[in-house]
Amino acid sequence: MATKSVTSWANLLQDSLLFIHKNNGLNSISSWRRCLGRGVFMLFACFLLGHSANAQNFRMLRDVKVNETVLDLSQSDCKVIPRNAMHSCHRLTSLTLPPKLDSIGTQAFFACDGISGKLYFPATTRVVDASAFNGCCQLTELSFDGSTRIGAFAFANCRGLREVRLSAVVPPVCADNAFDGIDLSRVKLIVPAQAKKAYRNAPGWRNFFSRHEMENVCDPENLLVPRPLKLEVYKKSLPLKWKDVVGVEAPQELSNEKMQAERILAERTVYKKGRKTGPMVRLVLDKSLTNDEAYTLQVNDKGVTIKGRTATAVFYGLMTLEQLCIGNGVSSRSVKIPALNIVDEPRTAIRELMVDPVRHFIPFEDLKGFIVEMARYKFNALHLHLVDDQAWRIEIKKYPELVEKGSDRVGMDDMPEHISGYYTQDQMRELVRFAAQYHVMVIPEIELPGHEVAAVHCFPQLSCAKKPVPIRLTCGVSNELLCPAEPFVYEFLDNVLTELADVFPAPYVHLGGDEAGQPPLGAWSDCAACTALKKKEGYTENWQLQQYLFDRVINKLHSLRKTPMYWYEQEFKTIQPGCVVYAWRHGLTKTAIDAAVRNKAKIMLCPGEHCYLDYPQQKGDMPEKNWGMPVTTLEQTYRLDPAWGQDSVFVRDNLLGVSGTLWSECINSAERIYYQAFPRAAALAEAGWSVPERRSYKEFLTRVRPLTDDMQRRGVAVNVR
């Protein structure tokens, strides 16, 4: 950059900005790619990130994928790098911080695991906040010229780190867990000679000389999410010391749960193999319990006993035990837990999270990781949104074109990255087996009659127009609907559903059903075949055609012994027997509930104002690109009432469960899925599990804090504001 004069750079920047402006502004991806070479990109970054740089500015660099691997801010006047600035930007390999930097926000460079080499923090740097560089595993050197305060987990899991150099004579404030997840015996700490003793005794820095583990205190009343039905702590009784524990005892039917218990002992406690006698962790099947998911958990100095009617119930007891081991979250290993007794069972039958690999593909291994995390909070269903306008993501052997042509595209709104990928049936069978180890069922979703552009792209005869259409590159609602008068539609759906039923053993298949055009179902009004079908059947309205389509598909699912699910819309005038509807639209939950009660149907609650976890958790939070999304705060999610004010008869006869949705128009990395989900998913889990009398938002904030600390320690993204 030094080889050009300031004037020539300014002229080049002016020409570039003018070109962008004439080509639809900053969101014109082709403009970015045509006019921004590396040098101009650097200058553009400096222009964009001036004194008033904000999250939206950084989003332009993070998510609008100019194919740059270097972020050089050495010429920038930027003083504040905000929270999440380049969150999970895996393409970055090099970072140079601005010379007048004041602060780096929470998770600003979280999981930027490509950044390598040395990072220099100028003397002006006042703060590096929580998890700012957590997971930057290729960083090797850190150099601080000033007295920079270093927040919790700021450099956790930077496992490639080999040298940390500081100029400050007085040790800067540093969280004791700032460098968690690193073997500090391999890291050289270089400080002024006269300050070595001070650093040796200073929190955070002392860990470079010898590990100082704070004792993990377990206070059960201030732990546990979801909150159990009954909890008694016996403070006058002797606690269980993990160093005394011998091992795990369980019948053959609980072999999977025994492995989970052994994992908890190995990862979460100071237990060591080798003792011959002492306390045991005992897992017991107890058929006297009346609820299949009910468990009891007893702890005393003689050991741990978890009883459940089923293996699932015992597993939930183990997830509670694991949270007890996390304790107050200051250490990765538990020394002891107090004597206690827990009696627990869920309020609702299904606690579900939905992920959307269509808009942004989710790699297979990342789906597995998400299952492990959601199971910690006793979620028991992963809802996979496999089909939409933007892609078809599941192999259908009868129609290989669906993934050959329908799983690849370039772009999602203003994010121009190449997005491709699909799941084979063998992968999904493996996922089902993996999820079963965590007592999570996998529910597949296709779409009809709308959100089917990818299918119509592959098979134009599915639509009324019978014309080829491109895969959609934007969010929103398309008028390309499946044609209810087309015989091939039913042949196609029969074959797709038959294959899905064979791959996914869960008793449910989700059929979509939402947002079928603008106006809803309007595309059928101009279709001669649909008009003829109306006349033949004596119909006068398009909603009757939708009923006709769904009746046939639902009958097919019933023949496959599957329960149909779909998103409730007002165009559904009746709900077919044996179906499950989802209340999702803002302001229409009561309407959906009334329809479910009237039709004796089951209902899942996922109203957007509480359960749309892809919405930002607070104003200005990710995703900063906002096409009308409201904020869904942690408190809003927590305050979801699954009964929606209805009586106990509704809870008994109609309420099936709760669901949190993670639509991925703006979620373009696995880390961002976790960030959007947690801790709101934990709040939703408590809404679906715990009875109202045991719920308190204020107390939840206390109870969830150790769990979010634990996630950061493990390098899992979580919204910690």
Could you describe each region identified by the protein language model?
Residues M1-N57, C218:
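Bacterial Sec-dependent N-terminal signal peptides
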Residues T290-E491, N495-Y508, W524, R552, ...:
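Feature activates predominantly on carbohydrate-active enzymes
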Residues K65-V80, H90-S103, D113-V127, C137-R149, ...:
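Structural signature of tandem-repeat unit edges
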Residues P564-E569, T574-R721:
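Flexible, acidic glycine-rich loops studded with aromatic residues
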Residues E480-P577, G587:
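Active-site neighborhood of glycoside hydrolase catalytic domains
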Residues F179, E215-A349, L560-E571, R705-R721:
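Acidic, contiguous N-terminal accessory segments
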